[in-house]
Amino acid sequence: MQVVPELETGGAEQTTIDVARAVIEAGGRAFVATRGGRMVARLEADGGRLAQMPVQSKNPLVMLGNASRLVDLIRREKVSLVHARSRAPAFSALWAAQATRTPFVATYHGVYKANSALKRWYNAVMTRGDLVIANSDYTRDHVLAEHGLDPAKIVSIPRGVDLDRFNPGWVPPLRTEALREAWGIAADDRRTRFLLAGRLTRIKGHLTIIEAAAQMKAASRHDFLILFAGDDQGRTDYGAELTAAIAAAGLQDAVKIVGHCDDMPAAYLLCDVALLPTTVPESFGRAAVEPQAMGRTVIASNHGGTVETVVDGTTGWLVPPGDPAAWAEAMTRAIDLGAAARLRMGESGMSRTRQLYRVDAMCAATLGAYERILEARA
């Protein structure tokens, strides 16, 4: 049973779906305890089973109630292993696992800040089980340094990409055309298209890109179109701030907020370059790997897990985070490189992604970790 706050959108959520599918294909049953979200339909279509409860809550009384619900579920369904993917639900999941003597695993999907002893204790819940899974070597090194964990208790399993879904040969032109029309891009628009995919939240670096675009416009560059694909998930103030910043810079024709996208393979094919301008380190950065699987060049912040997934000058470029001038320079370089050279870089990224970041390899490693824990507990 996996426990995740929500199944809306994001790397942890996609990995939850991937692992649930792998468990089912291996002959097991896959439960996911979560508040819910738009990806529940995919879970259930794969044969996974939803256990809906407010595991996203940080209210201690709600967390205790969740633990009780999880205990009942573990006993009723004879759950053999509990896997938490976030801190707040990890407390409920850990208590339930301890009460039922069920093996407990936690995945570090992010690098959590710890500016006090209390916060460090809160974060440490992820390390209190049988095994910690880190989603990159960067994350593994952070956990070891932060918590002094026995290295034998932590394993790095890089996130994987579904290469059946993210395969440029399997996306018909009708899908990219439908997206082009939905996003209001003219059929004869020949500008270089940049895509920043991800929920509208400050750490994703949208404001850096808006300022970079303003600098490019000031340098008389008008041969680009930037698309922000993602919804605000209730952060309406930030969405309004982005809209105002675009208008203030006179970039309404060059920067568009297009909302949530369900067809990311088509979105990457529709565009020329993917952007990942995060202002804080991504522990892995699936948004840097998926476009490479689709043969697209990536420009990413030079920190965190993207240092592992993007090869500077070969599959894309690494740029100082939060530096609009550096981002303007990198984006201008990508435009001037030309389509043929960008595609050659994209082919390098696609080849590397297929070698290192396959979802089947990630799932096999995760199920292998489960098996070792169950054997050790037997």
What are these regions (language model features)?
Residues 32, 297-300, 310:
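Short hydrophobic beta-strand element within catalytic cores of glycosyltransferases
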Residues 10-18, 192, 196-215, 226, ...:
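A conserved mid-protein helix/loop that constitutes part of the nucleotide-sugar donor-binding site
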Residues 312-313, 317-325, 332-339:
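Conserved acidic donor-binding segment of nucleotide-sugar-dependent glycosyltransferases
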Residues 234-241, 251-261, 267, 317-318:
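Active-site donor-binding acidic/aromatic loop of nucleotide-activated sugar
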Residues 33-38, 161, 197, 225-240:
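Glycosyltransferase donor-sugar binding loop
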Residues 84-90, 108:
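Short His-centered aromatic/hydrophobic patch
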Residues 333, 340-356, 365-368:
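A short, well-ordered alpha-helix in the C-terminal region of glycosyltransferases
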Residues 98, 104-134:
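A conserved, positively charged/aromatic
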